[in-house]
Amino acid sequence: MTDNTDNDKLYRYLFQDRAVRGEWVRLNQTFTDTLNTHQYPKVIQNLLGEMMVATSLLTATLKFEGDITVQVQGDGPLKLALVNGNHQQQIRALARLQADVSDDMSLAQLVGKGVLVITIAPTEGERYQGVIALDKPTITACLEDYFVRSEQLQTQLIIRAGEFEGQPVAAGMLLQIMPDGSGSPEDFEHLATLAATVKEEELFGLTAEELLYRLYHEERVEIFPSQPISFFCGCSQERSGAALLLISDEELDEVLAEHNGTIDMQCECCGTHYFFNKAAIMQLKVEK
C-alpha cells in the first residue's frame, strides 16, 4: 500500500557535497479533482498530469510571487491543453478537443503542428513568454530543452502520469545544476544517471525521503520542509459577470431569449455553473 504522507506535496532538496539542487512532487487528490468534472480520454488525462507536475516544478523555481501558465496549442485533435499554477502551489488545468482521440496516439498525433507556450507572470513586474516547438516525443523532453535553452543550466526532468492502486496519480523530479556556477557537469551527470534508474511505482508509491534514499543513499541530501499542493480554480460569479459585460446588449438579449431567460455559464476548469437572468445582468451594468 502507498504511504499517503507525501501525497499532494512538493519537496526541495540539495546535495551537500555537490552544487546540484532537486525537486520532487506528487499529485494525487489535486490530479483527481482536476479530472472529476471532465470525461477526458486517458491519453489526455495523462498529458494534463505531466503538464501539472511540470508546472508545479517550474513554479517552485520562481524567486518571486506570481504564476506560470504552461499550454500546448496545435491544429491536431487536441486544440489546447493548459495548466496554471502559482507560487502557493495552487494549480488548475483544462483541455479542449476538436476531434476524437485514441489512447495510443503520440504527442505529435495529438497536437499536429503545435507549440508549447510558457508564460511567467510575476505579481509585480513584466511578464515573460517563451514559445517552444513540440519537436520531441514527450512534453517532458520539450520542457527539459526549454530549461537548457532559457536558463542555460543542465537540467533533468523525470515525469510520469497514470494510475497507481486504482487512483489517478502524477509525479516527477527535477534535477538542476546550481545557477551560481559552482557546480560541475560531472557531478550533475553522476546524479542524473542515478535519478534515471527510478521506477514509476517508486515515484507513485514511496515517500520523498524513501525515494531519495533509494536513489542517493551514498550522497548527503538535505531535504527542506514540504509545500502542499492543491487544486484551485479561482472562478467566481463576479468574474463570470465581467465576461458577460463584454458582450453587446443585442447579443445578450438573443442568448437570454434562446435559453428561457437565463444564461448558464460553466467554468471550464472546475465545472461550476453561474446563472444570470435579465435582472442580474442589469444589476451588473449598474454596478459597473
Curated annotation (Swiss-Prot):
Under oxidizing conditions two disulfide bonds are formed involving the reactive cysteines. Under reducing conditions zinc is bound to the reactive cysteines and the protein is inactive. GO terms for biological process: protein refolding. The keyword Protease does not apply. This is 33 kDa chaperonin. It comes from the Bacteria. Transmembrane segments: none annotated. GO terms for molecular function: protein folding chaperone; unfolded protein binding. The gene is hslO. It is found in: Cytoplasm. Gene3D superfamilies: helix hairpin bin (1.10.287.480), Hsp33 domain (3.55.30.10), HSP33 redox switch-like (3.90.1280.10). Redox regulated molecular chaperone. Protects both thermally unfolding and oxidatively damaged proteins from irreversible aggregation. Plays an important role in the bacterial defense system toward oxidative stress. Keywords: Chaperone, Cytoplasm, Disulfide bond, Redox-active center, Zinc. Its main location: cytoplasm.
